[in-house]
Amino acid sequence: MTSEPGLSGGIIAAGEGSRLRQAGWTVPKPMVPVAGVPLIESTIRNFVAVGISRLSIIVNEQERDCAAWVLARFSELDLRVIVKTTASSLESFREVAGAPEAGRMLVSTVDAWCRPDDFTRFVSSALRRPRDATVLAVTPLIDDERPLGVKMDAEGRVTALDVASPALVTAGVYLVSERARRLEPPPHLGRLREHLGWLLDSGEPMFGEVIETVVDVDRAEDVALAESLAAARPSR
């Protein structure tokens, strides 16, 4: 077991997946398979692999069947499934992060596909950071059309976000401090990436930990890349 006692998790799975639908997938985005396993299943299994059994998951209102599938598939877990169509990634994040459990929360987007061993290494490293800090998973694998570049100092502390020509970008997995979970953002913020920048500017201690192989699964080519990584020999 990698996680600390009582650590809860959150999964953001409320996006529409429009580009995958245009590419021919007929299932909701969380149910898109990579190497035969739906994204939502592989994400949940990553949380289970680090010892987290209490999860808050948000899906949109067109994904009620997905919510029912998750509850049936993982009946042994303590799941809080929110069925709500949100206006933004930030709203979805706040729905998940607002769960009643105290303390830090490990949050992942459903389309941040990575192998369990890489996920486990990230969580192990992130938990060694100060409890009052938020830790971002960052990756050198830049396949996103609009990546959020991260600049860090030699100790891994994040010094700037949304930097040009980055060597590392956010990977869609976050260990969020209790403070950051409860802070009310300014009303003009609409996207999670903007919220992260605001947290950093507001004095939130923020660190980055590298996940070498993580894919933001938004397009057909992303599915192909994730499947090639799934078939490759796991890193050690």
Which stretches of residues belong to each language-model region?
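N-terminal nucleotide-binding beta1-loop-alpha1 segment
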Residues: 1-25, 204
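Short acidic/polar active-site loop segments enriched in Thr and Asp
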Residues: 7, 53-54, 103, 132
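A short, N-terminal amphipathic alpha-helix
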Residues: 37-54, 95
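Short internal beta-strands
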Residues: 54-60, 136-138
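A conserved acidic beta->alpha catalytic loop
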Residues: 62-64
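Conserved beta-loop-beta/alpha segment of the NTase-like Rossmann-fold superfamily
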Residues: 66-153
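Catalytic-core segments of class I nucleotidyltransferases/pyrophosphorylases
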Residues: 124-127, 142, 157-236
